[in-house]
């Protein structure tokens, strides 16, 4: 293909030329052979330069629509963010410091729903999850408070709610932390985990509900697969914030 120009962009690392936008399609190098004389469009691939954010975590995403959405960056809590106590079996903390909790009450459809999966939906998902569990007793007064009487709602629930733990986090003095949505969690896998910016060696909950019994989670052990799983199962969590 011959000599290719290099490009620069503030806050990003240039990662080559590709046949599709945003680093999709096929990478084109100086050794690539094309046949034919027609012009071809090439697209630069950019990798966001992760840096330490105002809350002491890792900023891993820049929102291209920040003027409309009202937030520009996503910041993940740092390793060791959780300072709570593990129970006698240690189920609330993993070897890297990320705690394990249930997603929430199993068998109940949240209203408003928390089915948002896209980038930018984690905050509203989290607020809806917290409000639902905080007020569940009002819908079922005979069962009482969910956090103290979880088995009244489902005999497999233990009263922990992943989104509530994230919302209660006050890292860096900020109170706007939330449980990431399905797509926000995948960004953390692609940008932070695969590039060794932080320690993620577990299965992680997202804030994206699937149905009354299941929510989306992601495997950070290797391939990064996402799937729905029972909400009464315990998985690791890592809060993020938008600013």
Each model region followed by its residue ranges:
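C-terminal, surface-exposed recognition/capping segments
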Residues: 14-16, 47-48, 65, 159-161, ...
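Short hydrophobic beta-strand that contains or immediately precedes a catalytic carboxylate
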Residues: 76, 179-180
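Short, charged low-complexity linear motifs
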Residues: 1-7, 84-85, 187-193
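Predominantly extracellular/luminal cell-surface or secreted proteins
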Residues: 17-20, 61, 77-79, 188-191
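Short, compositionally biased
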Residues: 45-172, 221, 231-243
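Intrinsically disordered, low-complexity segments enriched in Ser/Pro/Gly/Ala and basic residues
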Residues: 6, 37-40, 92-93, 105, ...
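Secondary-structure capping and domain/repeat boundary segments
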Residues: 1-48
């Amino acid at each position: 293909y011959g000599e290719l120009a290099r490009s620069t962009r503030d806050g990003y690392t240039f990662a080559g030329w590709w046949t599709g936008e945003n680093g999709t399609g096929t990478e084109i190098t100086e050794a690539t052979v094309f046949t034919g004389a027609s012009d071809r469009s090439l697209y630069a691939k950019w990798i966001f330069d992760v840096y330490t954010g105002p809350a002491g975590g890792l900023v891993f995403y820049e929102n291209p629509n920040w003027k409309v959405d009202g937030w520009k960056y996503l910041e993940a809590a740092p390793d060791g963010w959780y300072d709570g106590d593990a129970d006698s079996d240690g189920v609330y903390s993993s070897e890297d410091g990320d705690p394990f909790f249930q997603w929430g009450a199993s068998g109940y459809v949240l209203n408003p729903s928390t089915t948002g999966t896209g980038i930018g939906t984690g905050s509203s998902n989290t607020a809806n999850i917290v409000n639902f569990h905080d007020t569940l007793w009002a819908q079922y007064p005979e069962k009482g408070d969910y956090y103290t009487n979880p088995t009244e709602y489902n005999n497999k629930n233990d009263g922990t709610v992943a989104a509530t733990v994230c919302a209660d986090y006050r890292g860096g003095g900020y109170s706007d932390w939330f449980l990431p949505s399905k797509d926000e969690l995948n960004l953390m896998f692609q940008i932070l985990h695969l590039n060794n910016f932080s320690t993620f060696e577990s299965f992680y909950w997202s804030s994206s509900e699937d149905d009354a019994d299941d929510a989306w989670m992601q495997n950070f052990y290797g391939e990064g697969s996402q799937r729905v799983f029972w909400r009464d199962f315990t998985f690791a969590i890592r809060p993020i914030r938008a600013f």
